[in-house]
Structure formats: structure tokens, C-alpha cells
């Protein structure tokens, strides 16, 4: 069950009959102004950097699946997370949702066997090589504008 999650879009169970659904999240530290990236260790794009996330199961909502994936991959999901949709990418085989989540400070992720490292890095200073899909996302102008707006210091 999701506790304390705020989202600006619907949280309904998704019809998986047409596409596979995946979701990922950019965790951003307010204190250090850096984003969390994970180094892949498995047979899907090994040695590439990505963000926490993965495939949503057929009986899960988008947010339930994202929360489960984060707990599995980094053993962390903020109790009162405010998730902001950044991008929705659709092709013939899958739909991938990318979210932004501000955390007060960096945390040390407890990695599962899918990942062998992590790094907190500044925007546009991402580690290389990035997962091909994430590379496209972070180099998309609209995404960069959204990230810039979301990471601006609020007075």
C-alpha cells in the first residue's frame, strides 16, 4: 500500500494488454543539488548507468510498481514522496514513465544484485555510459527544462 505519495496524475491500475509498462525515478538531493544514478550489473545493458525503476506488474498501479522497484533495487522509497511526472515515452513494445522526486539529503542505497555501484551527480554531469533510453531522456530539451525548473531554489 502506498503511504503519503502525492502525484499530479492518476494512480490507476494499467491495462497491460497493449504494452509493457515501466517506470523510473530521478531522486534529487535538495542539500547537495545532485541526482542518484545506479550502475547496472546484470545482463541487460551491463556497465550502463540508470535510475531506480523497472517493469510494473499486471496487478500493480504505476506508483505501486515504482515503489516496489525502488525498494527492491535500493531498499529506499521516501515515506512522503512527491512524485512529479517528467516524461512518458511510448513505442511499439513498451511505455516508460519517468518521475522526479526531491529528497532532503543524499542517502546510501542498499543495492541488490542488479546493480554494482551508485553515484550522486549534478545535472548534466551524469556518469557514462548511460543506459540508451536514459541517455535520450536526459538529452531531451523538454526534460532538461522540467528538471531545471524542479531543482530551482524556492524562496
Where do the PLM segments sit?
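Unchanged
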Residues: 54-143
Amino acid at each position: 500500500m502506498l503511504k503519503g505519495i502525492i502525484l499530479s496524475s492518476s494512480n490507476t491500475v494499467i491495462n497491460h494488454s497493449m504494452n509493457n509498462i515501466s517506470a523510473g525515478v530521478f531522486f534529487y538531493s535538495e542539500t547537495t543539488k545532485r541526482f542518484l544514478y545506479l550502475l547496472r550489473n546484470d545482463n541487460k545493458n551491463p556497465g550502463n548507468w540508470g535510475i531506480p525503476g523497472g517493469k510494473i506488474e499486471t496487478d500493480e498501479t504505476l506508483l505501486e510498481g515504482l515503489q516496489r522497484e525502488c525498494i527492491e533495487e535500493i531498499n529506499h522509497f521516501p515515506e512522503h514522496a512527491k512524485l512529479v511526472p517528467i516524461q512518458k515515452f511510448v513505442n511499439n513494445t513498451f511505455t516508460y514513465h519517468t518521475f522526479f522526486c526531491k529528497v532532503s539529503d543524499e542517502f546510501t542505497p542498499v543495492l541488490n544484485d542488479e546493480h554494482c555501484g551508485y553515484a550522486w551527480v549534478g545535472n548534466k554531469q551524469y556518469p557514462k555510459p548511460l543506459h540508451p533510453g536514459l541517455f535520450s531522456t536526459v538529452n531531451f530539451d523538454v526534460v532538461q527544462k522540467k528538471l531545471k525548473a524542479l531543482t530551482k531554489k524556492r524562496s
